[in-house]
């Protein structure tokens, strides 16, 4: 349901105090741009959506530029980014035009190559962690597992 509803939204405004988590991933999977403000550096719940967004964006200059436009550094930036993106969006018939439409296309097309949605890599890494944990247990070793 989230994904279907997110498709009709032009921009998802994240809450700075406690960010979207699973909903952020669903919104980004739909291609809808997400604007976030990681207000508190010491609160993981305030930084979550920025991390999810970075994982959904493509590597390279286009993804880096999009991150600068969608991750605000202050409340003033958050408001300015939201207003700027909203005012820049126009519809020609039913077709959206503007930076917000470009960001939607970028996110939608990045789904198949982004780190966030790379399920095969995630499963491979998890299986590797299980193998390492088993080997350490058999040897009587403990400790962390680094992948």
Which stretches of residues belong to each language-model region?
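Catalytic binding pocket for nucleotide-activated donors in carbohydrate/polymer assembly enzymes
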Residues: 6, 15-115
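An anion/phosphate-binding loop that grips the pyrophosphate of nucleotide cofactors and donors
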Residues: 9
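Receiver (REC) domain switch-region micro-motif
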Residues: 12
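C-terminal alpha-helical cap of glycosyltransferases
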Residues: 118-147
